[in-house]
């Protein structure tokens, strides 16, 4: 019982919660920030709305990363009496924090780049390719967190 304390699953639940909460916060910020840029740009150039929706889609993908890890963690949560160790709880917490905080950072980056990018693309269409490349690098930050989280999750 010493290696399976009653508070072990608490850390696993916190890992699942932090995975979805922080990545959803990043996705929401990215969507809101780039969405305001799209709204401001579409007043003058409404034909560019569909082309400018890419940052919003990329921000939404960040939340999916957190959802995947949260579901994985929630699926392996169990009672301490069923061999859910404190080690598993800490691993799940680390995995959730890894994907959550990297998703938060990626969402912030996508939002800021997406806002400035769609406004700039409306005035100079050649900026579109550069905006997409920067958005890809911002999205990869969230993907790195997903990779680390899945790697940690498999260590149980």
Curated annotation (Swiss-Prot):
Q: Which InterPro entries match?
A: ATPase_proteolipid_c-like_dom, ATPase_proteolipid_csu, ATPase_proteolipid_su_C_euk, F/V-ATP_Csub_sf
- Enumerate the SUPFAM superfamilies for this protein: F1F0 ATP synthase subunit C
Q: Which GO terms describe its molecular function?
A: proton-transporting ATPase activity, rotational mechanism
> Location of site Essential for proton translocation?
139
Q: Which UniProt keywords apply?
A: Hydrogen ion transport, Ion transport, Membrane, Transmembrane, Transmembrane helix, Transport
User: Transmembrane ranges?
Assistant: 8-30, 53-73, 93-114, 127-152
Q: Which residues lie on this side of the membrane: Cytoplasmic?
A: 31-52, 115-126
What is the membrane topology listed in the Swiss-Prot or TrEMBL record? Multi-pass membrane protein
The record's subunit annotation is: V-ATPase is a heteromultimeric enzyme made up of two complexes: the ATP-hydrolytic V1 complex and the proton translocation V0 complex. The V1 complex consists of three catalytic AB heterodimers that form a heterohexamer, three peripheral stalks each consisting of EG heterodimers, one central rotor including subunits D and F, and the regulatory subunits C and H. The proton translocation complex V0 consists of the proton transport subunit a, a ring of proteolipid subunits c9c'', rotary subunit d, subunits e and f, and the accessory subunits VhaAC45 and ATP6AP2.
Query: Record's PANTHER family?
Result: V-TYPE PROTON ATPASE PROTEOLIPID SUBUNIT
Function, as annotated: Proton-conducting pore forming subunit of the V0 complex of vacuolar(H+)-ATPase (V-ATPase), a multisubunit enzyme composed of a peripheral complex (V1) that hydrolyzes ATP and a membrane integral complex (V0) that translocates protons. V-ATPase is responsible for acidifying and maintaining the pH of intracellular compartments and in some cell types, is targeted to the plasma membrane, where it is responsible for acidifying the extracellular environment.
By what name is this protein known?
A: V-type proton ATPase 16 kDa proteolipid subunit c
